[in-house]
């Protein structure tokens, strides 16, 4: 899922990247390692998660990764305009977050992950309110094998939606 999200983000050549709702920072770290000289901002409002992002930044030597403790959209106010943004969590503030992002950069590339149909629909509608191109929705379904008697069966995990729009990432 992370690899697909990062591919949709199309962050090559970006100078400023955000990971909103960064959690423990797995996407932030990967963006940092991929981005070279770009500045990556991991925005997270849970204190324990912020501590883990800091530890992961040190562990993987991500000097270009900046940890921002705060809740979006307020935590975005003082940050430089982003070229691309991954949104993994919004605490219900997705329209407000998108408004700030497109205000900072009208051509920003955004990828949102969602597990709820309602969140996917909200992301699609909100993104399309700010862009001239339709948003793209991709559903990813992962199944893992499990031993079942003499054979194996596949057990499905819940689907995840990737909603992307804006910018000029390869389609």
What does each of the following model-derived ranges do?
Residues 43-82:
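S-adenosyl-L-methionine
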Residues 98-156:
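C-terminal substrate-binding/active-site "lid" region of AdoMet-derived donor-dependent transferases
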